[in-house]
Swiss-Prot record:
One of its GO terms (biological process) is RNA polymerase II transcription initiation surveillance. GO terms for cellular component: cytoplasm; INTAC complex; integrator complex; nucleolus; nucleoplasm; nucleus. It comes from Homo sapiens (Human). Gene3D superfamilies: Leucine-rich Repeat Variant. The keyword Ubl conjugation applies. Pfam families: HEAT_2, INTS4_8HBD, INTS4_C, PDS5. Component of the Integrator complex, composed of core subunits INTS1, INTS2, INTS3, INTS4, INTS5, INTS6, INTS7, INTS8, INTS9/RC74, INTS10, INTS11/CPSF3L, INTS12, INTS13, INTS14 and INTS15. The core complex associates with protein phosphatase 2A subunits PPP2CA and PPP2R1A, to form the Integrator-PP2A (INTAC) complex. INTS4 is part of the RNA endonuclease subcomplex, composed of INTS4, INTS9, INTS11 and inositol hexakisphosphate (InsP6). Interacts with BRAT1; interaction is required for the assembly of the RNA endonuclease subcomplex. This is Integrator complex subunit 4. The keyword Repeat applies.
Length: 963
């Protein structure tokens, strides 16, 4: 046996390997079916015009690629020449216009054919559609002046067509393609330059009103394109103001306004007199006259345009508020003026009354000075119009003119105050907002203030709060006015307790604006007596707090006022200064230290040192890779603490400081999770450390979502860094999961998903990759081919090494960044009385919250209700529930419906506001994604929510239903 084995060992084995010829793989070329061929087949199958029209309608619903457009156009033109039915030719002409707008297709190749078929066409409808197609071609080729002039020539030839539709399209083409310059390029030397304005102006007197309207709109289109219109157009436009059709009058009003802005100082003669006037004043009078037009559409447009005519003379401006009666378009003269004219004339009469039957010249109403007739009482008519749209437009115009003229603001005050009693809520609200905008130029009299304060009884919360805002910036003339305002506001507080915060804020500004008027009222308001001690008021009374807010804010600039305070007033001041610091200012009281605010006034102007400190702190942190892990952690912790404190001290730097601190916190969590002592020992022996790393990865993910969606002003540079940090957190999560998961099947799927995330990052942020040198993603993309073919264990090992070796990316700070915040005003969460309702039914809970620096609150802000049993309910407020009182500020006033089964005792539910986000909607779209590759469902879905308000606890008690 041994000999046999020995023999086998020494034997030589030979093996012949014959290379087999590889079978050549068959290459398949996938081609898309030709759109032009399919259309040709369909049109050939059509047995009637109705069938052909149906095929064309089906084709119009399908998208066409740029490379297929020319072939499709040729097929359509071929069938156009063969087709006898005008409806089919009309549809083909429409399709030619749509196809010429296709991105990536140059329509100059079909222009000659379009012009040829235009010259032979007899149908007016098809002619109009072909002109529309030529307009689309010319709009697509704005740089080719030869084509533009050729199309203008075609339009001019067809302007004599009998159809109004054809003339309309020709004028539209002239307005959009007419040459703005007199210089002609070499390509267009053969074509004579035309005076487009004169051609269009000739059609101002066309017999068809639709053509007249199209001519005016074409002239306005020339103005929008940058061509300066001739002043001669002004007289033509003025004649159109008396046109029988409202569309013509509406367009003419707009054209007159445009010319008045181009030539405001030009002098124009007044008809039937030797006087002259500025063009802007004349135009103002004519537009004022249109405020009394028979059509409410024209009246609205005229009223809106009046507000933008700020160059008009003050004399004509003040005439708009003149209530003098008009007779035959002339001012009614006084009896003295009439008698004087009568006796000075020396005219004959019957003898019973001097000048009784003297012949008088008949008044020519058309020759009367239009300035006198138009501007006189224009706003009076507008504010008393039967249509509320006209009244709103007149109020807005008054606001714009009053802001530029303080004298006009004083004169229009009575009219605005009268509008507070309008029957339409929208008009009342607009009047209040208008008056608030001009409040710096006016001082209210007592009778006006009385009318204004009467609106506090309005049932609309929006009206009342708008009036509170108005009173914040209103000047009152007397102490009786201040007392009247306080009394009415306290009545409002009694009738509508939910207005408490708005009324307190109103009294804060009312007191700070009128310290000298509040001073003589202090003894009466505080019920103090020179000889007797009075009872101490209840500090829980909102009305008493309102009075104190008024007095304390007035005392800030009135040093003699604290001497009138009693002892309990000083105690109440200390209490309110702590509890309502945003309403009660710091006062220098006798015998007491100044209660200073968090930021003293001497520090406020010095913003540069704070900004410098912020920059130095961040630059110091960016040298982390040169430190040992322990030193890096300590440096990050100290810097985060400094940035948080800086945000508390400097409110204007709070957003930047919090944003930077959050980013550094993510880096700190990553460094702690990657400590070597956690990874040198087998994972089963360090389950606690694995949980720590997993929690760190989860927290980093949450912090990155906060950075991306809770801050306004974040630019694309910051979004890239945030997504990079999130990718590192996902890599850490994969590493931890790989160490604690048994089996390879789950890891294959997780690795594949992570590599898809990397590919996703590369595709969407490809333009920013050069700025990510030596970063985690940069190294990851270099090793991407190797990672695609590696086993999960090797992928995890590579990721762990790269996470430790990757550089700390520099976070560029945006210029202006603010953190989103929300404060729930109602419910206050102070009541111990439960809200009782029958189980199974619903109860409405009023929610009132202020939102700061929230982007798109209508789609992102949600209300969450958390029940004691762990159930959570998310409510989507209606868009109408959001108000926008100022830039960066929103107000949410809504109702939340609660329901639950019966409870044995009252418990608390938590109400908070959430910020919903979807990261895919924030990422910039790439060119190849514009074709609708992403479904709309993905973009509108909610990926997660971030709490951004403190929770408020509300007692509720669902009672069992009675049987």
């Amino acid at each position: 046996m041994a000999a046999h084995l020995k023999k086998r060992v020494y034997e030589e084995f030979t093996k012949v390997v014959q290379p087999q010829e590889e079978i050549a793989t068959k290459k398949l070329r996938l081609t898309k079916p030709s759109k032009s061929a399919a259309l040709h087949i369909d049109l050939c199958k059509a047995t009637s015009p109705a069938d052909a029209l149906q095929y064309l309608l089906q084709f119009a619903r399908k998208p066409v690629e740029a490379e297929s457009v020319e072939g499709v156009v040729r097929i359509l033109l071929e069938h156009y020449y063969k087709e006898n039915d005008p409806s089919v030719r009309l549809k083909i002409a429409s399709l030619l216009g749509l196809l010429s707008k296709t991105a990536g297709f140059s329509p100059d190749c079909i222009m000659d054919d379009a012009i040829n078929i235009l010259q032979n066409e007899k149908s007016h409808q098809v002619l109009a559609q072909l002109l529309d197609t030529l307009l689309a071609i010319g709009t697509k080729l704005p740089e080719n002046q030869a084509i533009q002039m050729r199309l203008v020539d075609v339009a001019c030839k067809h302007l004599t067509d009998t159809s109004h539709g054809v003339r309309n399209k020709c004028l539209q083409l002239l307005g959009n393609l007419g040459s703005l310059e007199k210089s002609v390029t070499k390509d267009a030397e053969g074509l004579a330059a035309r005076d487009v304005q004169k051609i269009i102006g000739d059609y101002f007197s066309d017999q068809d009103p639709r053509v007249r309207t199209a001519a005016i709109k074409a002239m306005l289109q020339l103005h929008e394109r940058g061509l300066k219109l001739h002043q001669t157009i002004y007289n033509q436009a003025c004649k159109l103001l008396s046109d029988d059709y409202e569309q013509v009058r509406s367009a003419a009003v707009q054209l007159i306004w445009v010319v008045s802005q181009l030539y405001p100082e030009s002098i124009v003669p007044i008809p039937s007199s030797n006087e002259e006037i500025r063009l802007v004043d004349d135009a103002f009078g004519k537009i004022c006259h249109m405020v009394s037009d028979g059509s409410w559409v024209v009246r609205v447009q005229a009223a809106k345009l009046l507000g933008s005519m700020e160059q008009v003379s003050s004399h004509f401006l003040e005439q708009t508020l003149d209530k003098k009666l008009m007779s035959d378009l002339r001012r009614k003269r006084t009896a003295h003026e009439r008698a004087k004219e009568l006796y000075s004339s020396g005219e004959f009469s019957s003898g019973r009354k001097w000048g009784d039957d003297a012949p008088k010249e008949e008044v020519d109403t058309g020759a009367v000075n239009l300035i006198e007739s138009g501007a006189c009482g224009a706003f009076v008519h507008g504010l008393e119009d039967e249509m509320y749209e006209v009244r709103i437009a007149a109020v807005e115009a008054l606001c714009m003119l009053a802001q530029s003229s303080p004298s006009f603001a004083e004169k229009c005050l009575d009219f605005l105050v009268d509008m507070f009693n309008d029957e339409i809520e929208e008009v009342r609200l607009q009047s209040i907002h208008t008056m608030r905008k001009i409040s710096n130029n006016i001082t209210l009299r007592e009778d006006q203030l009385d009318t204004v304060l009467a609106v506090l009884e309005d049932s609309s919360r929006d009206i009342r709060e708008a009036l509170h805002e108005l009173l914040c910036c209103t000047n009152v003339s007397t102490k009786e006015g201040i007392h009247l305002a306080l009394v009415e506001l306290l009545k409002n507080l009694t009738k509508y307790p939910t207005d408490r915060d708005s009324i307190w804020k109103c009294l804060k500004f009312l007191g700070s604006r009128h310290p000298t008027l509040v001073l003589p009222l202090v003894p009466e308001l505080l019920s103090t007596h020179p000889f007797f001690d009075t009872a101490e008021p209840d500090m829980d009374d909102p009305a008493y707090i309102a009075v104190l807010v008024l007095i304390f804010n007035a005392a800030k600039t009135c040093p003699t006022m604290p001497a009138l305070f009693s002892d309990h007033t000083f105690r109440h001041y200390a209490y309110l200064r702590d509890s309502l610091s945003h309403l009660v200012p710091a006062l220098r009281l006798p015998g007491r230290k100044l209660v200073s605010s968090a930021v003293s006034p001497s520090i406020i102007p010095q913003e540069d040192p704070s900004q410098q400190f912020l920059q130095q702190s961040l630059e110091r942190v960016y040298s982390l890779q040169h430190l040992d892990p322990q030193g890096a952690q300590e440096l990050l912790e100290f810097t985060i603490r400094d940035l948080q404190r800086l945000g508390e001290l400097q409110s204007e730097l709070a957003g930047v400081a919090d944003f930077s601190a959050t980013y550094l916190r993510c880096q700190l969590l990553l460094i702690k999770a990657l400590q070597e002592k956690l990874w040198n020992v087998a994972a089963p022996l360090y389950l606690k450390q694995s949980d720590l790393a997993s929690a760190a990865a989860k927290q980093i993910m949450e912090e990155t979502y906060k950075m991306e969606f809770m801050y306004s002003g974040v630019e694309n540079k910051q979004v890239v860094i945030i997504h990079h940090m999130r990718l590192q957190a996902k890599a850490l999560q994969l590493i931890v999961t790989a160490r604690t998961t048994r089996g390879l099947d789950p890891l294959f799927g997780m690795c594949e998903k992570f590599l898809q995330e990397v590919d996703f990052f590369q595709r969407y942020f490809i333009a920013d990759l050069p700025h990510l040198q030596d970063s985690f993603v940069d190294k990851l993309l270099d090793l991407m081919p190797r990672l695609m073919t590696s086993k999960p264990a090797e992928v995890v090992k590579i990721l762990q090494t790269m996470l430790r070796q990757s550089a700390f990316l520099h976070l560029p700070l945006p210029e202006q960044i603010h953190k989103a915040s929300a404060t729930i005003i109602e419910p206050a969460g102070e009541s111990d009385n439960p809200l009782r309702f029958t189980s199974g039914l619903v109860v409405a809970l009023d929610v009132d919250a202020t939102l700061e620096h929230v982007q798109d609150p209508q789609n992102t802000v949600k209300v969450q209700v958390l029940y004691p049993d762990g159930q959570a309910q998310m409510i989507h407020p209606k868009p109408a529930d959001f108000r926008n009182p100022g830039p960066g500020r929103h107000r949410l006033i809504t109702q939340v419906y609660l329901s639950h089964t019966a409870w044995t005792e009252a418990c608390q539910v938590e109400v908070r506001l959430l910020l919903a986000y979807n990261s895919s909607a924030r990422i910039p779209k790439c060119p190849w994604m514009e074709g609708g590759e992403m479904s709309p469902q993905v973009e509108t879905s909610i990926e997660g929510t971030i709490p951004f308000s403190k929770p408020v606890k509300v007692y509720i008690m669902p009672k069992p239903a009675r049987r």
